[in-house]
A protein has these predicted regions:
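Active-site acidic-Proline motif in GNAT/NAT acetyltransferases
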Residues: 74-80, 108-110
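Conserved catalytic-core motifs of GNAT/GCN5-like acyltransferases
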Residues: 105, 118, 123-140
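Conserved acetyl-CoA-binding loop-helix of GNAT-fold acetyltransferases
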Residues: 79-93, 115-119
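Conserved hydrophobic beta-strand within the GNAT/NAT acetyltransferase core sheet
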Residues: 68, 102-106
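Acetyl-CoA-dependent GNAT
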Residues: 6-76, 87-89, 93, 97, ...
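Terminal substrate-recognition subdomain of acyl/acetyltransferases
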Residues: 136-150
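Short glycine/proline-centered loop/turn elements that form peptide/ligand docking sites
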Residues: 83, 87, 110-113, 130-135
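Extreme N-terminal starter segment of soluble prokaryotic enzymes
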Residues: 2-3
Length: 150
């Protein structure tokens, strides 16, 4: 059984290992820790039964917009629904924080992630040319509009 929870400072090593396993140009451990500790950020982790971090997600809150910065699942644990669970939970948390719009970027070649985001209500709204490096690639901007809380 896995646990989905808010990230703690003590999770930084696990988050960093996921970052290195998933991204060709990973954030440094220091950058991740700095980001984790800022008040207007939300971070989640997926923790395995043995306590190992197998995924994480991060977001920034800017005015009434949430920017999902990273969603990463260790390659050995992909296709098990953890990415969708984290995205749903992060979306709920951003909504509770008053965010009216949520944005993210995804590599144009990452068809699986795009399909997941579409299933969760995100739509493509633009392209950031040469947004990614190693390899250089465009980033598809996807957005989700949040309904008002009743």
């Amino acid at each position: 059984m896995v646990t989905l929870r808010e990230a703690l400072r003590s999770d930084i090593e696990g988050i960093y290992q996921i970052e290195k396993a998933c991204f060709s140009t990973p954030w440094s451990k220091e950058a991740l820790l700095d980001d984790l500790e800022v008040e207007d950020k939300l971070y989640l982790v997926v923790e395995a039964e043995d306590g190992k971090i197998i995924g994480y997600a991060g977001s920034w809150l800017v005015l009434d917009e949430g920017q999902i910065t990273n969603i990463a699942i260790h390659p050995e644990h992909r296709r098990a629904g953890y990415g969708a669970k984290m995205t749903r939970k992060l979306t709920q948390m951003l909504r509770k924080q008053g965010m009216k719009h949520i944005f993210l970027e995804v590599r144009v070649s990452n068809i699986a992630a795009q399909a997941m985001y579409r299933r969760l209500g995100f739509t493509a709204v633009g392209v950031r040319k040469q947004f990614y490096s190693d390899p250089v690639e465009d980033g598809l901007i996807m957005a989700k509009e949040m309904e008002e809380l009743a």
